[in-house]
Amino acid sequence: MIDKSAFIHPTAIVEDGAVIGANAHIGPFCIVGPQVEIGEGTVLKSHVAVNGQTKIGRDNEIYQFASIGEVNQDLKYAGEPTRVEIGDRNRIRESVTIHRGTVQGGGLTKVGSDNLLMINAHVAHDCTVGNRCILANNATLAGHVSVDDFAIIGGMTAVHQFCIIGAHVMVGGCSGVAQDVPPYVIAQGNHATPFGVNIEGLKRRGFSREGLVAIRNAYKLLYRSGKTLDEAKLEIAELAEKHPEVKAFTEFFERSTRGPIR
């Protein structure tokens, strides 16, 4: 179903069964598959390919040569009906690739809202990207990676399968991330190691001075105290009882399977 207010360029191919919302814009030479849903006000600039069971929300801008919902690169994939979901108000720049999930990974690749995916960024099968994240040029997420809200991943950075990039993290460019990055942390290098707390980013997002001090104290317990990881976790949990900002650390530890970067 194509809303009567949507614009479809004469050279675009929109297959029967696709749903195109009000005021959406499908530009020259775009291809939209039969199981695709594109929300109100979303713009496909030109030469964009959207395939598979893909749902895109409203007011997104998707630039030329982006490919969304295509068959993933997992060799186990055998054509199962897996999905891609993208939220609202994202900017997906030129040549970005976002692949559909696998049944082994839950069947869904998900991108939230208000994100910026710069040129050539890659979001592999079964990844989850939160809200207000930035993936800079050529940033690459392997399968099953989770990127939490407000995280920034620098250009040319590669993230290993199943890693977690915590909320408000900043990963420097040309890094290789092979373990989980705790929330609020600046990481850099190959393999990425911690370089402190993302204080400037947190200030811009309105964190209180008291909250920043608590986050720094949690970071020191984890990385500067000389304690074992289990000992640091216990003391951080105690700190989280008094400071809600620190709960992000305890929640991260519960999810982490690869262990925090060291």
Curated annotation (Swiss-Prot):
Keywords: Acyltransferase, Cytoplasm, Lipid A biosynthesis, Lipid biosynthesis, Lipid metabolism, Repeat, Transferase. PROSITE patterns: HEXAPEP_TRANSFERASES. It is an enzyme of class 2 (transferase). It is found in: Cytoplasm. Its EC number is 2.3.1.129. Pathway: Glycolipid biosynthesis; lipid IV(A) biosynthesis; lipid IV(A) from (3R)-3-hydroxytetradecanoyl-[acyl-carrier-protein] and UDP-N-acetyl-alpha-D-glucosamine: step 1/6. Involved in the biosynthesis of lipid A, a phosphorylated glycolipid that anchors the lipopolysaccharide to the outer membrane of the cell. Belongs to the transferase hexapeptide repeat family. LpxA subfamily. Homotrimer. This is Acyl-[acyl-carrier-protein]--UDP-N-acetylglucosamine O-acyltransferase.
